[in-house]
């Protein structure tokens, strides 16, 4: 991974490596090793953070209610660092597209991250601002025609060493691998299969939590909060996020999703 980050391989070698790793599937040990290589190249200052909140998937069936959960937690004093890799797939709604509307600070460097956390307890930063080599690998998705393991790796980074890392892995079988990788790194983590691949509990289904605390793995099963499934909206209207945040509308699905995600 160090050679990839330092630009010491050809583009064809990089693509071949990523696709081979995707085919064989990355192990917890490999993910932990890759993360160590990335962290050793970060120049992040010591900034106290409670939650590391990666946001790389985007939503397509429901609005990104997790953003309101993050805002509510920040308002209660929880310091949250969010990071993402841009709107890389058509037809999905990404965190970056809603930052201004929801008054979430978008930070270009670590100094503005620190200032935003001091003022708002919430800061977002684009991966390309602080690890451009990794962002370039994510951007190869359209060229390669496949999601590479870098999309998974970005969720483990926890670049500021938050007290707890949150991760959402949508594809079955990968959640435990991510939990184990974070455990190997000495991080406290909670991994879920969040709605759309984002850190958002779906209140209509049972949720399994894969955790690691102090190097000890644990599992929890959370029951569905709704007795029946909600009908998915015909379209995603960002104004509905704002209306719910202001208390102008009642909507059981996002209200339950917010409660479960904040818990």
Kindly label every feature range from the protein language model.
Residues 23-25, 57-61, 87-89, 132, ...:
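Short, small-residue-enriched loops and turns at beta-alpha junctions
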Residues 3-6, 20-33, 88-111, 124, ...:
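Short, structured segments at the rim of ligand-binding sites
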Residues 34, 39-45, 101-107, 112-261:
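Glycine-rich anion-binding loops and their surrounding alpha/beta cores
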Residues 48-116:
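A generic, well-ordered mixed alpha/beta core segment in the N-terminal half of proteins
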Residues 17, 69, 178:
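Aromatic/hydrophobic pocket-lining residues that form π-stacking "cages" and hydrophobic walls in ligand
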Residues 1-63, 72-76, 80, 227, ...:
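Acidic, glycine/proline-rich low-complexity segments that act as flexible tails and inter-domain linkers
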Residues 18-22, 95, 156-164:
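Active-site-proximal beta-alpha loop/turn segments in soluble metabolic enzymes
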Residues 13, 65-69, 95, 174, ...:
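Catalytic-loop motifs flanking and including active-site residues across diverse enzymes
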């Amino acid at each position: 991974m160090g050679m990839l980050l330092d630009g010491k391989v050809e583009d064809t070698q990089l693509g071949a490596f990523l696709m081979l790793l995707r085919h064989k599937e990355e192990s917890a040990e490999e993910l932990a090793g890759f993360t160590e290589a990335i962290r050793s190249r970060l120049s992040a200052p010591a900034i106290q953070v409670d939650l590391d909140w990666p946001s790389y998937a985007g939503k397509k069936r429901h609005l990104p209610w997790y953003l309101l959960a993050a805002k509510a937690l920040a308002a209660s004093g929880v310091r949250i660092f969010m990071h993402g890799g841009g709107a890389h797939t058509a037809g999905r709604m990404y965190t970056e597209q809603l930052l201004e509307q929801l008054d979430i600070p978008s930070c270009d460097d670590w100094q503005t991250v620190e200032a935003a956390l001091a003022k708002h307890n919430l800061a977002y930063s684009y991966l390309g601002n602080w690890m451009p080599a990794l962002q370039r690998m994510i951007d190869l998705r359209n060229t390669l025609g496949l999601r590479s393991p870098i999309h998974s790796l970005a969720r483990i980074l926890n670049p500021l060493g938050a007290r707890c890392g949150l991760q959402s892995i949508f594809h079955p079988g990968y959640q435990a691998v991510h939990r184990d990788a974070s455990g190997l790194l000495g991080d406290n983590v909670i991994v879920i299969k969040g709605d759309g691949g984002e850190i958002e509990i779906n209140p209509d289904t049972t949720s399994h939590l894969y955790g690691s605390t102090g190097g000890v793995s644990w599992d929890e099963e959370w029951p569905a909060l709704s007795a029946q499934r909600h009908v998915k909206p015909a379209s995603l209207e960002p104004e509905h996020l704002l209306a719910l945040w202001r208390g102008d509308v009642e909507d059981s699905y996002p209200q339950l999703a917010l409660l479960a995600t904040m818990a």
